[in-house]
Amino acid sequence: MTKSELVAQLASRFPQLVLKDADFAVKTMLDAMSDALSKGHRIEIRGFGSFGLNRRPARVGRNPKSGEKVQVPEKFVPHFKPGKELRERVDGRAGEPLKADEPDDER
């Protein structure tokens, strides 16, 4: 699902929201989540999962073209851990083929 598909689904589920308002709501939520993560905070959405940061230590890598050793600095990367309810809901689909173009509300 893309951000624009999420906006469209939000607008269709809540008829009082026009597409512009749904887009604003999604952008505001994503901005707030990005800001929290960039400040090192953890985000927990009960029943869905949590977002946090994982530290990747500095290491020695290789330049693929020259084979030269390159120092790769330490960095933090976003990480998502699904909650129990989400894991169970997804696990209920085990064995079903993945359908990339199937609308979510028809599942």
UniProtKB/Swiss-Prot annotation:
Sequence ranges of Basic and acidic residues compositional bias: 82-101
This protein's UniProt keywords: DNA recombination, DNA-binding, Transcription, Transcription regulation, Translation regulation
Annotated CDD domains: IHF_B (cd13836)
InterPro entries: Hist_DNA-bd (IPR000119), IHF-like_DNA-bd_dom_sf (IPR010992), IHF_beta (IPR005685)
Record has Protein biosynthesis as a keyword: no
Cellular component GO terms held in the UniProt record: chromosome; cytosol
Gene3D superfamilies noted in UniProt: IHF-like DNA-binding proteins
Ranges that cross the membrane: none
GO molecular function: DNA binding; structural constituent of chromatin
GO BP: DNA recombination; regulation of DNA-templated transcription; regulation of translation
Region Disordered, annotated ranges: 78-107
HAMAP family: IHF_beta
Similarity remark: Belongs to the bacterial histone-like protein family.
Quaternary structure annotation from Swiss-Prot or TrEMBL: Heterodimer of an alpha and a beta chain.
Function: This protein is one of the two subunits of integration host factor, a specific DNA-binding protein that functions in genetic recombination as well as in transcriptional and translational control.
Protein name: Integration host factor subunit beta
Gene name per UniProt: ihfB
